[in-house]
């Protein structure tokens, strides 16, 4: 089975430099399976936020111009918590960072539900910040999967976790559709409570991940960030990331609210976002081959062109 392949050592442990290296891949199969499931569950967090936050913001905001502020705060939370999440993983291990992130996932669901019940716009904004912190941790799942398997198994491990992202694109919108009317008249309150439950389930899955805590030797060395940031390739990559993420957020933020204001149902808005997220993750299965054949610059340019056309 494919899962068994992930657990097989790709190289003789005697060729490795560190004594702990033979144990590095001992739980490869279990780790990749858990990270894939967690990606599907935790990845639904961002989808729920994008599907509902602008609509809830429009209903709760003191001024309709602030309707999309909760999603902006979600993005700020993701950016602000990326480095702290990395620091926690570096000093205390990735599983600790994962559980801290899923803890934020539970909080966003509980606080958002309370905000809807109380009609508090600013509490809802605070909730989406925790959602951003949760999303920052979820972004690291794929890298953790790559690090916990032998080098020649990494593409397959990444494919598994990215497949979890495709499932997240289905779970998130369907979660909204199935739960948005569970607590009338508090529209979406049931959705946020369900989101908290899904985050707790993800925490239970991630609690079984067995990744080694980094040693001092692992944390030592490396180039200063200032040296890296001055490289043209780094600047190009960051610029492409900023532009593409800005445009993607613009589309994902406005689309659900615009669809509702055009008279379409919430179910239709959820379905539109579902296909958007599936299209985000599904190409990951063959993007690597395209980069190998055409080069990263051409593939990045094609991606920006597609975003512009959309």
Residue locations for each model-derived region?
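Helix-to-loop junctions at the C-terminal end of transmembrane segments
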Residues: 81-93, 180, 283-296
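Juxtamembrane intracellular "pre-TM" segments in multi-pass secondary transporters
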Residues: 12-29, 211-239
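Pair of pore-lining "gating" transmembrane helices in MFS-fold secondary transporters
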Residues: 25-58, 230-251
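Short amphipathic helix-loop junctions that connect adjacent transmembrane helices
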Residues: 52-64, 253-272
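C-terminal membrane-cytosol helix-exit motif in multi-pass small-molecule transporters
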Residues: 176-177, 196-216
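C-terminal ends and interior cores of transmembrane alpha-helices
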Residues: 103-118, 306-310
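Cytoplasmic helix-loop-helix junction between adjacent transmembrane helices
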Residues: 127-163
């Amino acid at each position: 089975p494919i899962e068994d392949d992930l657990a097989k050592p790709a190289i003789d442990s005697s060729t490795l430099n560190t004594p702990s290296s033979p144990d590095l891949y001992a739980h490869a199969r279990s780790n990749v399976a858990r990270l894939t499931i967690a990606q599907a569950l935790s990845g639904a967090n961002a989808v729920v936020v994008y599907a509902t936050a602008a609509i809830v913001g429009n209903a709760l905001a003191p001024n309709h111009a602030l309707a999309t502020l909760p999603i902006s705060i979600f993005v700020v939370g993701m950016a602000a918590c990326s480095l702290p999440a990395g620091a926690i993983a570096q000093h205390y291990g990735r599983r600790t960072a994962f559980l801290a992130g899923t803890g934020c996932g539970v909080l966003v669901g509980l606080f958002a539900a309370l905000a809807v019940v109380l009609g508090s716009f600013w509490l809802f904004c605070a909730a989406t910040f925790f959602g951003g912190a949760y999303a920052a941790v979820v972004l690291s799942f794929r890298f953790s999967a790559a690090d916990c398997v032998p080098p020649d198994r990494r593409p397959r491990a990444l494919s598994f976790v990215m497949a979890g992202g495709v499932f997240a694109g289905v779970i998130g919108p369907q979660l909204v559709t199935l739960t948005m009317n569970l607590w009338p008249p508090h529209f979406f309150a049931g959705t946020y409570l369900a989101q908290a439950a899904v985050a707790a389930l993800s925490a239970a899955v991630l609690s079984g991940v067995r990744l080694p805590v980094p040693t001092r030797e692992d944390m030592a060395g490396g180039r200063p960030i200032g040296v890296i940031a001055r490289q043209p390739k780094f600047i190009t990559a960051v610029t492409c990331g900023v532009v593409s993420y800005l445009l993607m957020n613009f589309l994902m933020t406005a689309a659900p609210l615009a669809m509702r204001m055009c008279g379409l149902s919430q179910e239709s808005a959820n379905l539109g976002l579902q296909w958007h997220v599936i299209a985000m993750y599904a190409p990951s299965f063959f993007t690597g081959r395209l980069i190998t054949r055409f080069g990263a610059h051409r593939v990045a340019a094609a991606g920006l062109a597609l975003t512009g056309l959309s």
